[in-house]
Amino acid sequence: MSTRLNFLPDERFAPLRASLKERLQKMADLITPENFPSLLDYRSGSLLRDVFAAVRADEGSVWILDQAKEHLVVSYASGPHAADIMGFKQPLSAGIVSTSFISEQGFAENDVYRHELHSRLLDEKLHVTTYAMIVAPFYILDACRGVISCVQLINVRHEDGRSVPMEEIPGGFSMGNLDAVKRSALVLTDLINYLLLRTAIGWEAN
């Protein structure tokens, strides 16, 4: 028979809670697309690579809101085009990733290249076509700071104003795949929040 272990707040720390919360908020506000990669370690990197592989994505990215709050910027990328994707800016006014961020809702879409919300800016930069996409909001502390996305890609040709796949289309993404990416986003949030907390209190932990 198992028993539940309940931890209670230590009231000795009560006078420090407001100061700690303020310090954590200031630390979070200093996070930018450019310095976000420094928050990732082997655990967070493995988490992202594993979930992208599990859902059979060709590419995966973490997008972080810029300081001007005008663009989402790719601050982590995994896949064959990772080096070309890093630093790419997506206006908040366009694209499924921006819609997910603004609404704080996850998306799992197939036939993305035919979707009216899909922004082709990154496809055109990389000379690829996005077939399927998952996007999940990503939080630091209590605020949405960006999204995690992953895609499946295809080659298409254009006939009579239509995009026609040149190869067998991928399997696409399911709602179960979206749930997997959402869970990984929650774990990544916990890892970064933990890093901020132990840095704020000067706790050296492995």
Report the location of each language-model feature.
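Sensor-regulatory modules in signal-transduction proteins
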Residues: F138-L141, N155-V156
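Signal-transmission linkers at sensory-effector interfaces
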Residues: M1-Y42, A53, V187, L191-N206
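Juxtadomain coupling helices with adjacent low-complexity linkers
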Residues: N6-P9, F13, I148-N206
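A short, aliphatic-rich beta-strand micro-motif
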Residues: Y131-Y139
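Glycine-rich acetyl-CoA-binding "A-motif" of GNAT/NAT acetyltransferases
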Residues: C144
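Short regulatory alpha-helical segment in sensory/regulatory domains of signaling proteins that mediates
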Residues: T32-F36, L47-R56, V62-D66, A82, ...
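Signal-transducing coupling segments at domain and membrane junctions
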Residues: A82-A83, N110-A132, E159-E167
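Regulatory sensory and allosteric helical modules in signal-transduction proteins
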Residues: L65, H71, S75, A82-L121
